Amino acid sequence: TFVNPLYLKQGSSFNYSGKNLGITDSFNVNGQKPGVKVLQFDVVHPDKDLQDNLFLKPSEFVYAFKRLRSLDDVPFMIETGYIPIKLAPELSEQIASESIFNYVESELGKEVNKTYLNISAEPSDAEGKELLNLADNEPVGLMEGIFFLDDGTPFEFSTMKLHYKYFKYDSFVDLANK
């Protein structure tokens, strides 16, 4: 197998090489210990946009959660997610304090292996400044999108605010094999 040295040199923060797209499995931690702190875990009625994104009926509910991700106890990401209750009825705050996608794989027998992401940057807000220890003039990287189960079912809508030092995403495009 040929590995392009440009890939090795760039050192992208994300390395999607496992079975699912979860941060626990995908973030290149270089020996650092990942951590998750649940800041909020509720059941809510989704707004119209969230219903559309997750293919929900108006009567359906979602888990709404906010988690602070860290490496060696240094916060790098604020994650806000919404998961339909019907897809993971036993989801709990305890599970959310670990890996939700690994739980889906081991307990529900499904994989979260597809995503549509919008990647951008924006000025940090009060939450980012406080939780990610950012100064007034420091931005956050923003990744927002839908994660899908292996059968194409929308599983989670998520917004991830990353400390700018961890916001690096490399891509390789090859149109030769059409």
Show the residue positions of the predicted features.
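Hydrophobic residues in beta-strands and at strand termini
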Residues: 3-4, 83, 162
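Anionic-ligand binding region
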Residues: 67-72, 81-83
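C-terminal regulatory/effector modules of DNA-binding transcriptional regulators
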Residues: 49, 55, 71-74, 86-87, ...
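HTH-adjacent hinge/linker in prokaryotic transcriptional regulators
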Residues: 1-53, 57-58, 88-98, 105-113, ...
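A short beta-strand signature within small-molecule sensing/ligand-binding domains used
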Residues: 61-63
